[in-house]
Amino acid sequence: MKTVTISKERLRIHIEQLGEIGKTKDKGVQRLALSKEDREATLLVSEWMREAGLTVTHDHFGNLIGRKEGETPSLPSVMIGSHIDSVRNGGKFDGVIGVLAGIEIVHAISEANVVHEHSIEVVAFCEEEGSRFNDGLFGSRGMVGKVKPEDLQKVDDNNVTRYEALKTFGFGIDPDFTHQSIREIGDIKHYFEMHIEQGPYLEKNNYPIGIVSGIAGPSWFKVRLVGEAGHAGTVPMSLRKDPLVGAAEVIKEVETLCMNDPNAPTVGTVGRIAAFPGGSNIIPESVEFTLDIRDIELERRNKIIEKIEEKIKLVSNTRGLEYQIEKNMAAVPVKCSENLINSLKQSCKELEIDAPIIVSGAGHDAMFLAEITEIGMVFVRCRNGISHSPKEWAEIDDILTGTKVLYESIIKHI
C-alpha cells in the first residue's frame, strides 16, 4: 500500500476560507440553500474538488457532485457526503467538515496515485438544513427518489419557490428533469459521512471522535392557529380568542410529552414562531410556529405527535380558534450498517484511537442514502456540544483524526 498523507493544513485552510462566505457580524455563518452565498461557496468547493482530481457536475436536485473514476467505472461507486448550506447564523463546521474531509481523502489518493477499482464520489447535498424552505434533507431525499412535486413548490420568506430557486441557480440545474438524477439500489456501494457531533457526549467523555450506530428520525410540522384580532386595551380577557396564548399551551405540552420518559432520547423543539399582524397593542389574529420532533424509535415518536395534534385540537376548540397542521417532512429512524461500523472500528484500532459507539439525535443526509446503500458515519467532538450557533467549534486535530479514520475505512472498500 502506498503511503498516503492527509493534509491537516489544507483541511484547516479550506474550513477557514469557506467560513468567510456568508460570515455574519458575530462570526457565524449564514448560507441558506440556493442563495448567492451558497452559489459562492459552491464555486469555491467545486474548485477544490477539481484540484483533488474530481470531475465536477451538478444533478437536477442541486447536489454538487465530484467524481474520480475507478479502474472499472461500471462498478457501484463509494460515496462520501454532507452539506455546505447552513442554518440562520450558524457555525462553520456543521456539514462542511464532511464535504471537505471527502475532498481531502480524494486529494491524498490522487497525490499518491492510489489505484482503485470503484469510482469515488464526493457530494455536497442541497439544502440539508431546511432553513430556507423549512423542508430539509432535500438533496439526499431527491437522490433516492423521495422528493414529491409539491416539495418543489415550497416557498421561502420572500415567496420564492424552491423550483424557482433551483431554476435560477445555474450549473445546468433544471428542476424539470429531477427524474434523471435519481439513484437506484446498486448504484452506490457504500456511503460514508463525517459530521460534528452537535452534542456534548464526546467532549464530556474525552473522545475525539465517535462511530454512529443509528440516526433518530426527525418529523417537521408547521402549525397555524387563527383567532380574532382586537385592541389590546378594550377587549376583556374573558372574551378574547388569542391564538398566541393557545400556541403557548401547545408548546408547553410539547415539552411535557417529550420529557415523560426520562430514559428516552425524545426531543421536541419549536424553533420559529410569528404572530400576525405583530403590533404591540394588537391581540394577534394568527400565529404560526414550527415543530421538530425526533426519536430513534419510530412508534414512540409517532405516538407523541398524535398527542400533540390532540392538544392542538383541544386548545383550538376550547379557545374558539381555527387550526392548520402542515406536515413538512418525516424521516424514519435508521441504523448504520454493521459492516461499516465494524470497518470503522477496525480503522480506529489500527490507528490506536478510542472511539465509542453513539446514536445521532440529529438528522443527516446519510439517513436517506440508507434506503439504497449501506451507510457509515463518524462524529467529531465539538466544544460544549454547541452547534447551529456562531459558537460552534471543532478542533482541527479532531477533524484530522476523523478524516484519517474515514480514509482507512474507505480505502478498504474502493
UniProtKB/Swiss-Prot annotation:
Its EC number is 3.5.1.87. Keywords: Amino-acid biosynthesis, Cobalt, Hydrolase, Iron, Manganese, Metal-binding, Nickel, Plasmid. It catalyses: an N-carbamoyl-L-alpha-amino acid + H2O + 2 H(+) = an L-alpha-amino acid + NH4(+) + CO2; N-carbamoyl-L-methionine + H2O + 2 H(+) = L-methionine + NH4(+) + CO2. The record marks 240 as: Necessary for dimerization. Its cofactor is Mn(2+); Ni(2+); Co(2+); Fe(2+). Homodimer. Belongs to the peptidase M20 family. This is N-carbamoyl-L-amino-acid amidohydrolase. Catalyzes the hydrolysis of N-carbamoyl-L-alpha-amino acids to free L-alpha-amino acids. Is strictly L-specific since it is inactive toward N-carbamoyl-D-alpha-amino acids. GO terms for molecular function: hydrolase activity, acting on carbon-nitrogen (but not peptide) bonds, in linear amidines; metal ion binding; N-carbamoyl-L-amino-acid hydrolase activity. GO terms for biological process: amino acid biosynthetic process. An N-carbamoyl-L-alpha-amino acid binds at residues 198, 231, 281, 294, 363. InterPro entries: Amidase_Cbmase, Bact_exopeptidase_dim_dom, Peptidase_M20, Peptidase_M20_dimer. A divalent metal cation 2 binds at residues 94, 129, 388. A divalent metal cation 1 binds at residues 83, 94, 195. Residues 214-333 are annotated as: Involved in dimerization.
